[in-house]
């Protein structure tokens, strides 16, 4: 099967489409500066990718740095777009095989799994009277930069594209015009790098002493006396029954990781009791005095958000209300969407109070000579007709033809929805589980408004023109920042509302209908028909 996938023209087309249109970084070039942004360029790239299946020579990656939450910078390696297309093609051939092997409690960078599943797994493991009260909160030190190439390639066995993967690993890095060879690690930023990290870490659970029941009604569940390891990429948590078991659960993986070039980060790895609490994937997990397990947004995450909101408002001094709404709306939507699956109601309310204070200060500063009543009448009111809230920040000057005032949404308007955790080792690649994944997609609803959510459900989540998923093809966003980018790139720019006029049997208009399609598909449709697009309806895709 891998050989068939590697030679498949359909795989090439899907890979090129994913890299050049669907991925968030499709406009980001590598060292060659080349990106395919038009239909003609994408078609030429697909032909070139398919012609060079066995002859492609990988290009060094371009080094860039992105800021981390702790103030440091994370190095990323951006491959050329041709390399990314080849990597996507190889990943599609390799991933199904490894998805059938991976541990059930590994959630990072896997199709159909994500942060919400890892957090839900923690809740299931620790809730109630669970005796696993000692926690190993572990973090691998620079895992992507240190993984041993030899061990990784040995794990791939006889995979047909193994040599090409080796070339990607050894391609090197170009930074400020100078070339540096890569003797270890897999660069963050590559399409295939997350899969390589999961392959390298496969077996960590067994090394930690995790054992599963193999028979009876509990087959597939963790043994009652066994620790539980929940991993998201290079970030993991081990839940043990005693301090001694926790020490062993930390020591055994450390020995297993050493030959693979990986070590625990001593500054971030610690053993704590569940009542002390710990942070994992942006949430704080602890058991309260009454024995109830609480999972809330971590204080560090809340502090970072408050600082960012304050910085944004400071930068907006002298701007108008429309700029304030445009700048803050994606931040609020993204943060609320990520934390809507945990105990966030109190935090959302506190953040709404903080955001209101920031907007009030901005309004007072913008009109320092005006009384409070004038400022209130100009910028605050009941602009959301579905909410009985008269202190919503809005832009009265931007009132549309229907009298609607653009306004700033609030955190608390995002409903708390418990996440439905993925079951065991279920994989989207398993044809026997097609009904399970279809039902799961219906239950796990994206944070859209009710109108567009109905359209999305009616279309089974797919674009009627290309039949690809409309929102997230591989997995949902995995952080508040990714949710923010998802809102900006997917909902605002990548999805369009198509306006249809149906006719009855006599050729007369028979009502108006709308459908959601990819913006790129709409542009291609307009290019083919050479017609001007009809006026879109008033309702557009937006988050709830």
Predicted region positions:
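Conserved polymerase palm-domain catalytic core
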Residues: 101-113, 117-277, 474
